[in-house]
A protein has these predicted regions:
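Solvent-exposed, charged interface segments at domain starts and junctions
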Residues: 1-4, 138, 145-146, 151, ...
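N-terminal zymogen propeptides
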Residues: 1-43, 50-52
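Conserved N-terminal glycine/acidic-rich loop preference
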Residues: 186, 215-220
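Alpha-helix capping and helix-coil boundary motifs
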Residues: 1, 8, 97, 132, ...
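A solvent-exposed, charged loop/short amphipathic helix patch at secondary-structure junctions
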Residues: 156-189
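Short, structured coil/loop segments at alpha-helix boundaries
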Residues: 7, 17-18, 79, 188-191
Length: 220
């Protein structure tokens, strides 16, 4: 059957577009993968206006601030842009390009000025995305005030090599529909956990991506 066929899918891999995927759970027979998301936020929000000499006149750098990130793997702590400001809080075994990229967007010091992060003198706590909700709660208790989560569940159609060949794969519930996935915007268990966490830790801000899924799918 379809579920048995999907049980042969890979549990974790990176596709041709450098997106990282990992099987997180199985929900009513549907495989639920996390996928990394990218954005051009630093350019769009004009962070440089807040720097010393910037148009806003604030001279902000992120100094004395701790930020958090959860992502697909270990941050490359040895990167020239990070110095000693990054702490990997878990035992993530393998460096991940996406995690390192997002941390660079957040806190790269500007050794290469084109790579300068939005909070270029901030410190950062990094964790891999498994067990994120519990780790976030503990980090909030430890005083973390802001964290970035540039990932989400695979929904609808996605192109990749889950089944051994690079092709479009359907991750909606085929018993409900084969061309429309109710999980887009669905207020599920994970979203509820994060809402409860945010309510119980009012000084902790969770920043999460909305995904890159719009328009995905094979030609009609």
């Amino acid at each position: 059957n379809l579920f048995a066929k999907k049980m042969e899918y890979k549990s974790a891999f990176t596709n041709e577009a450098n997106e990282s995927f990992e099987l997180i759970s199985i929900d009513d027979g549907t495989l639920r993968y996390f996928v990394t998301n990218n954005a051009t936020g630093a350019t769009l929000i004009k962070t440089s206006d807040l720097y010393s000499g910037g148009a806003a006149g604030f001279a902000l750098s992120g100094d004395c601030t701790i930020l958090g990130i959860w992502d697909a793997g270990r941050v490359r702590l040895e990167h020239q842009e990070f110095g000693t400001r990054i702490t990997q809080r878990d035992n993530a075994p393998t460096n991940n390009n996406h995690a390192t990229h997002v941390v660079g967007t957040m806190v790269a010091s500007g050794v290469n000025n084109a790579a300068k992060g939005m909070s270029h003198q901030a410190s950062l706590w990094a964790s891999e995305w498994n067990n994120d909700s519990a780790e976030m709660a503990n980090a909030a208790i430890d005083g973390l005030e802001v964290s970035q989560h540039s990932y989400g569940y695979v929904t609808g159609w996605h192109f990749g090599n889950w089944s051994g060949q690079s092709a479009w794969h359907w991750f909606g519930d085929p018993y409900i529909a084969d061309n429309e996935d109710y999980n887009f915007g669905f207020y599920g268990e994970s979203a509820q956990e994060w809402d409860i966490l945010a309510y119980n830790a009012p000084d902790y801000l969770i920043s999460s991506s909305a995904g890159n899924d719009r328009g995905n799918g094979p030609s009609p």
